[in-house]
């Protein structure tokens, strides 16, 4: 996989990625599901989902240089027809593509934007938006620093699980039908 020549990115290790997808399997994900990968960088999580049987992945990344690398990675992996790349700020659009509802959404913003989680914060506003863009029972996976604690609920999203690996944490939220 191609990656940017910068120290700004926070690539997820293969061990953590394997552990995360083991957790997702118990929710019958990602096989056959519609997925979004927000703040995707070079596409590691979305490409992993495709390699594990996801039907389609929408990648959202705002940095033009990173998008160019992402597109190379998608092409190299052979998933061009099963994916779409949107160059935009995910805080502004979420995962929006028409009226698509997503079964699984990865949210991996810069840690500096996730330190504030209370109502009205950028992360909170994004999660409320994603609650409208996810399918009923859809899963949203949010990567943050280990010390960041998300609220137990954002709109109709409820925190159902939290895992920690090293200095990072992953919080899994699920959309209820309410």
Task: List each model region and its residues.
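Class I S-adenosyl-L-methionine-dependent methyltransferase catalytic core
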Residues: 1-178
């Amino acid at each position: 996989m191609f990656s940017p020549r910068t120290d700004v990115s926070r690539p997820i290790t293969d061990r953590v990625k394997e552990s995360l997808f083991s957790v997702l399997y118990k929710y019958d994900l990602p096989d056959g599901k519609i997925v979004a990968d927000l703040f995707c960088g070079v596409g590691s999580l979305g490409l992993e989902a495709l390699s594990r049987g996801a039907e389609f992945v929408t990648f959202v990344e705002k940095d033009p240089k990173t998008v160019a690398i992402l597109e190379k990675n998608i092409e190299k992996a052979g998933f061009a027809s099963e994916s779409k790349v949107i160059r935009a700020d995910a805080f502004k659009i979420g995962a929006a593509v028409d009226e698509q509802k997503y079964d699984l959404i990865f949210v991996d913003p810069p840690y500096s934007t996730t330190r504030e989680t209370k109502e009205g914060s950028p992360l909170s506003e994004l999660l409320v938006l994603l609650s409208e863009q996810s399918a009923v029972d859809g899963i949203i996976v949010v990567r943050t620093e280990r010390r960041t604690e998300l609220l137990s609920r954002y709109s109709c999203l409820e925190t159902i699980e939290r895992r920690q690996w090293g200095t990072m944490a992953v919080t899994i939220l699920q959309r209820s039908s309410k």
